[in-house]
Amino acid sequence: APPPVGDQAGGRKVNCSKYNAKGSQFACSRHLDPVCGTDHRTYSNECMFCMLTQNKRFSVRILQDNNCDIECTQYSDMCTMDYLPLCGSDGNNYSNKCLFCNAVLRSRGALFLAKHGQCESP
């Protein structure tokens, strides 16, 4: 089955039009009120979230207020073999944060962290 999209993927949609009053220019304050996107990146506030996600190839929503539990900002395609398991919302185990973050990217933000550690066996 394809990964869930839209509301099924979790997160809330943001009305970004309130931040770009002057055409397509965003006027964001430096006020720190972090939010975590469904791309597992922490943005300093909702306005910065809107500005930095407007040109993404997929729709990013706000997963939670505050910093992300798992930060996927700086990961390459090449992952180490470290073993620090994470359980994804798809029920799959990911050996480490790098592999999980690459899966988040491939899922276009539909995958999120279910829990730290391995998923429960059926």
Swiss-Prot record:
<dbReference type="InterPro" id="IPR036058">
    <property type="entry name" value="Kazal_dom_sf"/>
</dbReference>
<feature type="disulfide bond">
    <location>
        <begin position="28"/>
        <end position="47"/>
    </location>
</feature>
<keyword id="KW-0677">Repeat</keyword>
<dbReference type="InterPro" id="IPR002350">
    <property type="entry name" value="Kazal_dom"/>
</dbReference>
<feature type="site" description="Reactive bond 2 for elastase">
    <location>
        <begin position="81"/>
        <end position="82"/>
    </location>
</feature>
<keyword id="KW-1015">Disulfide bond</keyword>
<keyword id="KW-0646">Protease inhibitor</keyword>
<keyword id="KW-0964">Secreted</keyword>
<protein>
    <recommendedName>
        <fullName>Double-headed protease inhibitor, submandibular gland</fullName>
    </recommendedName>
</protein>
<dbReference type="InterPro" id="IPR051597">
    <property type="entry name" value="Bifunctional_prot_inhibitor"/>
</dbReference>
<feature type="site" description="Reactive bond 1 for trypsin">
    <location>
        <begin position="30"/>
        <end position="31"/>
    </location>
</feature>
<feature type="domain" description="Kazal-like 1">
    <location>
        <begin position="10"/>
        <end position="70"/>
    </location>
</feature>
<dbReference type="Pfam" id="PF00050">
    <property type="entry name" value="Kazal_1"/>
</dbReference>
<feature type="domain" description="Kazal-like 2">
    <location>
        <begin position="71"/>
        <end position="121"/>
    </location>
</feature>
<feature type="disulfide bond">
    <location>
        <begin position="87"/>
        <end position="119"/>
    </location>
</feature>
<feature type="disulfide bond">
    <location>
        <begin position="16"/>
        <end position="50"/>
    </location>
</feature>
<dbReference type="GO" id="GO:0005576">
    <property type="term" value="C:extracellular region"/>
</dbReference>
<feature type="disulfide bond">
    <location>
        <begin position="36"/>
        <end position="68"/>
    </location>
</feature>
<dbReference type="InterPro" id="IPR001239">
    <property type="entry name" value="Prot_inh_Kazal-m"/>
</dbReference>
<dbReference type="GO" id="GO:0004867">
    <property type="term" value="F:serine-type endopeptidase inhibitor activity"/>
</dbReference>
<feature type="disulfide bond">
    <location>
        <begin position="79"/>
        <end position="98"/>
    </location>
</feature>
<feature type="disulfide bond">
    <location>
        <begin position="72"/>
        <end position="101"/>
    </location>
</feature>
<comment type="function">
    <text>This inhibitor is composed of two homologous actively inhibiting halves: one which inhibits trypsin, the other which inhibits elastase.</text>
</comment>
<keyword id="KW-0722">Serine protease inhibitor</keyword>
